[in-house]
Amino acid sequence: NAQVLQRKADRHGKLVKRQTLYDLLPIEKIENGILHTTHDRYIKILEIEPINFLLRSPREQRSVIYSFASLLKVSPVRLQFKSFSRKADVNAYLDKLRRDAANEPDADVRKRHMSYIRFVKRLGSRDAVSRRFFVIFQYEAPTNERNISYAEIVSTLETTARNFRTYLAQCGNAIVEHENEDEFLTDVFYTLLNRRTAVQVPLQERIQDVLASYLAQNDATALDKIPPAAFMIPPSLDLKHGRYLYMDGTYHAYLMIPADGYRAQVTAGWMALLVNAGEGIDVDLFLERQPKERMMQKIGQQIRINRSKIKDTSDTNSDFDDLSNAIRSGYYLKDGLANNEDFYYAAILVTVTAASVKDLEWRIGEIRKLMVSQDMNLQLCSFRQEAAFLSSLPLCAPDAALFKKYRRNILTSTAASFYPFVSFELCDTNGVLLGVNKYNNSLVSLDNFSTRIYKNANMAILGTSGAGKTFTMQLIARRMRLAGTPVYIIAPLKGHEFYRQAKALNGTIIRIVPGSPDCINVMEIRKIDHTSSELLDGPMPEQSELAAKIQKLHIFFSLLIPDLSNEERQLLDEAIVTTYRNKGITYSNASLDDPAHPGQYREMPILGDLHAVLSSAPETR
């Protein structure tokens, strides 16, 4: 039975009670974007967009940490922060490329589309990794109130979510908005528990399969009996091994940082080391705030006990240093609490996944080496893998025994340095895919026209000679063209380097050099699209396009003939107006349209027409 856990006999030879997979997920229902557990807990999950923290200036980093510390002070008592890595899902991007290819009229460009699609498929199936970040918190009832209504619970959780949105915006993070919050929560658990199946079977298809299986029971009320876990649980879960568990064709191992496994001092954003360790590495951070008054009392009591012990200990005894350090640490915590900081217990759980036991052991060894290089330590949760697995679920419910064993006491300032929403990714939705980030294997996709992310679309490509600046520019231009974005490249000295690219995409090459058949008609008038400006500033009064063009032509001629007199400028102005009038163009913008060909411009004059008008007048001949 795929729904029954496989467990090993205990040391006394007794089999552990058989338990179904449904029992592992204590989810009673999902409603209003809230998880209702079977233990009468109400869980809210928010997805957070990360920032590239390490590229920010020291001043900006301090600002982020201070804002995160402010968030911790007003957040619920128990928090879980989760980062989740998996193979990048490029299906949505591939669908967009296929639509662009279908709408492309040029057969040669469609061939380039097919090549681009194959490239994206290869990256998505082999190299690319995507990361998602979550914060999980639960409803915490006031101690002096009873009979709280469900509406009040929802309101409290929504208020907490708004606080996260406000303070995280100060950090530079945004909360991802989902059209259907209930479906989002289901997808989170489905993806976490079915790492292999979720790549091949989307959630919607899984939902249809579950509905079909219940309808096959010929029970009119079958759909009402479907538990939420039915859409999430993996096909199998093997718990027979002490060092790992096997779930949905993937091996999972769980490690934790012991209380003495941290460095004495860490820098802000140090968790970027773990978060960006690579594919198959997930990180869970648990924080639990303690009552300040009770902790002040306990710390003071422990200081007094240690001071009494150290009086009876010789300074040559090995215990003397331990007691001395404990006393100093106690005073440090006491001073911090007196300076308006809070006391927290923190624990970090690291999940390592792989397709085989060999790969799993290799990844465990590599992540341990990485931590040792930073003077930190990781311990495998041997024979506690099930408890660690349940702790890793986004339910803000770490196993009590594990949390007590591995927790570390910290203050607010230290907790803020655990800021987890750190990533090296540059992956913009609807951007042009450039490749894979070699530092953390994330996709590099750029959409510099996204006003939601960037203040403007300006971009600079810097590098040494031969580093690939021109190639990068060609790559961006090529893939923007494949995405249907018009691309213009002005290359005064390196135009020959773009010639082959333009020919391959059936582009137009314009050479502005002496003897070239191509030239620019400086007298051409084209209406400017003011749609974006009107959206920002409202409707603006219409201005004459001819008047604006005449002003620009005066600037043009003043550069050619700097010593024009006022009388000559007046004569030139009259000649320009006459030249446009001869083509039927007046100060009215409607005169720009060609009545013989609706939707097209009239034939525009050229400098030769202006020369003819000047030559025909006696005063300008």
What residues fall within each predicted segment?
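Switch/coupling segment of Walker-type NTPase motor domains
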Residues: 84, 475-577, 581, 585
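Pre-P-loop entry segment of helicase/translocase ATPase cores
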Residues: 409-417, 424-441
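Glycine-rich phosphate-binding loop of nucleotide-binding enzymes
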Residues: 429-513
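Short secondary-structure boundary/capping segments
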Residues: 96-100, 191-195, 395-399, 503-508, ...
